[in-house]
């Protein structure tokens, strides 16, 4: 029988690593509470049509990266490749963005894409999503960017990341620009890289995002998207940059920054780092003011971003920003297996009264000698002995495992006071 192994592109989070996730998640919640965003929890499976209509039929994600299947009713379902489409579906279905309502939401969970696994890019990956609905003005653009900015400062990595900004204009602006770009690229068709040639028919704007040096040289003299954007949207983008200057948020303009999802309009942004090789983007987002309406809801302004949690953890590890985990318990109990009905009751009472303490014991209840060996390995400061003699006399034995002090006795009714010291 063959050995069962984990599916390629998927990862186990081992006990020694889970504390890193808990630390990061606690920082995330701290920042989002500060901005008064509410958590929502979304299903990992949605109808395939949702992603076809939102992410886009021609996008790389829908065309070749989704995990699709049919259920027993013959319905086409998809493991979510990103979170925004499902969040918008929830907002529409539960009437959360009607009659001028506003929503500030966040979620964190696994997403799935069939990509070539590499460092920082997995087939199951965790993503933090932050979304705001019903806000038209620049203030929400600044707030959403400030959330990521605050998180990176809280984590101590702000100096290692760069905010890149661009504006995609309106849908009509992009259509006009796309035609101009295609016209410009006609003479260079044979010189473009393979992926860019495919994108000519499906999503020409994605050619701007090509990492191929030869393609970038061809694009150097191409028409600029900013020249096709309406005056009011250009002014809004300029004002956004001015407000970021006032806040002290560093950024750079990237006229080739386009998002791989079809629903983005207006402002788009990425936070990137040069510490993770090719997987440089750790956060990406922008406005998608037409998406709610496109999926059957009322016309609703919307903006959001996503952070790849694995990439963020990799960056924190590479920069030495994660503290070592302290697996040591505080107290280790040495118990007589013949008297467990009494001694376990004492242990559980202490756990209830002092929930801040990490308490452990040898649940195999071997000899006292073997239990003491495990107590020494546990890292506990104190071992508490409850054997037959201790139960008969009403006193627990106290052995200090990290200090050269004599063993003491403490009455059972004083144990909690002793441990609180």
Curated annotation (Swiss-Prot):
The answer, when asked if ATP-binding is one of the entry's keywords, is yes
Sorted keywords for this record are: Aminoacyl-tRNA synthetase, ATP-binding, Cytoplasm, Ligase, Nucleotide-binding, Protein biosynthesis
Entry's InterPro entries?
Answer: aa-tRNA-synth_II (IPR006195), aa-tRNA-synth_II/BPL/LPL (IPR045864), Anticodon-bd (IPR004154), Anticodon-bd_dom_sf (IPR036621), His-tRNA-ligase (IPR015807), HisRS-like_core (IPR041715), HisRS/HisZ (IPR004516)
- How does the annotation summarize its subunit structure? Homodimer.
Q: Where, if anywhere, are coiled coils annotated?
A: none
Enzyme class at the top of the EC tree: ligase
Q: Where is the signal peptide?
A: none
What is any one GO biological process for this UniProt entry?
A: histidyl-tRNA aminoacylation
- Its recorded name reads Histidine--tRNA ligase
Q: Reaction catalysed?
A: tRNA(His) + L-histidine + ATP = L-histidyl-tRNA(His) + AMP + diphosphate + H(+)
The UniProt entry's GO CC annotations, sorted and at most eight, read: cytoplasm
NCBIfam families hit by this protein: hisS
Q: Which Pfam families match?
A: HGTP_anticodon (PF03129), tRNA-synt_His (PF13393)
EC number of the protein: 6.1.1.21
Molecular function GO terms recorded:
ATP binding; histidine-tRNA ligase activity
Where in or outside the cell? Cytoplasm
Q: Which family does it belong to?
A: Belongs to the class-II aminoacyl-tRNA synthetase family.
Q: Which PROSITE patterns match?
A: AA_TRNA_LIGASE_II (PS50862)
């Amino acid at each position: 029988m063959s050995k069962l192994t984990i599916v390629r592109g998927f990862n186990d989070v081992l006990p020694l690593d889970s504390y890193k996730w808990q630390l990061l998640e606690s920082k995330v919640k701290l920042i989002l509470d500060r901005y008064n965003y509410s958590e929502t929890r979304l299903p990992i499976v949605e109808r395939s049509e949702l992603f076809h209509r939102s992410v886009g039929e021609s996008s790389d994600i829908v065309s070749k990266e989704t995990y699709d299947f049919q259920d027993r009713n013959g319905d086409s379902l998809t493991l979510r490749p990103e979170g925004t489409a499902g969040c918008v579906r929830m907002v529409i279905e539960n009437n959360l963005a009607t009659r001028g309502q506003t929503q500030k939401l966040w979620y964190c969970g696994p997403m799935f894409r069939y990509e070539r696994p590499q460092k920082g890019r997995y087939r199951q990956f965790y993503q933090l999503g932050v979304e705001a609905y019903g806000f038209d003005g620049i203030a929400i653009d600044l707030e959403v960017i400030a959330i990521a900015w605050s998180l990176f400062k809280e984590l101590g990595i702000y100096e290692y990341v760069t905010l890149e900004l661009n504006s995609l204009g309106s849908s009509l602006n992009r259509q006009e620009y796309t035609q101009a770009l295609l016209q410009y690229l006609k003479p260079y068709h044979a010189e473009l890289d393979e992926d860019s040639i495919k994108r000519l028919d499906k999503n020409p704007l994605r050619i701007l995002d090509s990492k191929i040096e030869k393609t970038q040289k061809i694009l150097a003299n191409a028409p600029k998207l900013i020249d096709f954007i309406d005056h009011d949207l250009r002014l809004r983008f300029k004002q956004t940059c001015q407000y970021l200057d006032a806040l002290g948020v560093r950024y750079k303009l990237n006229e080739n920054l386009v998002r791989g999802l079809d629903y983005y309009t207006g402002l788009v942004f990425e936070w990137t780092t040069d510490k993770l090789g090719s997987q440089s983007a750790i956060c990406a987002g922008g406005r998608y003011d037409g998406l709610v309406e496109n999926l059957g809801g009322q016309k609703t302004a919307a903006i959001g971003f996503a952070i790849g949690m694995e990439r963020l953890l990799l960056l924190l590890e590479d920069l030495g920003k994660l503290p070592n985990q302290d697996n040591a318990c505080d107290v280790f109990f040495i118990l007589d297996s013949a008297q467990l009905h009494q001694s376990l009751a004492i242990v559980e009472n202490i756990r209830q009264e002092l929930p801040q303490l990490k308490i452990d014991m040898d649940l195999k209840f071997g000899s006292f000698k073997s239990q003491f060996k495990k107590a020494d390995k546990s890292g506990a400061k104190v071992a508490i002995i409850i054997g037959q003699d201790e139960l008969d006399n009403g006193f627990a034995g106290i052995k200090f495992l990290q200090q050269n002090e004599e063993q003491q006795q403490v009455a059972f009714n004083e144990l909690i006071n002793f441990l609180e010291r």
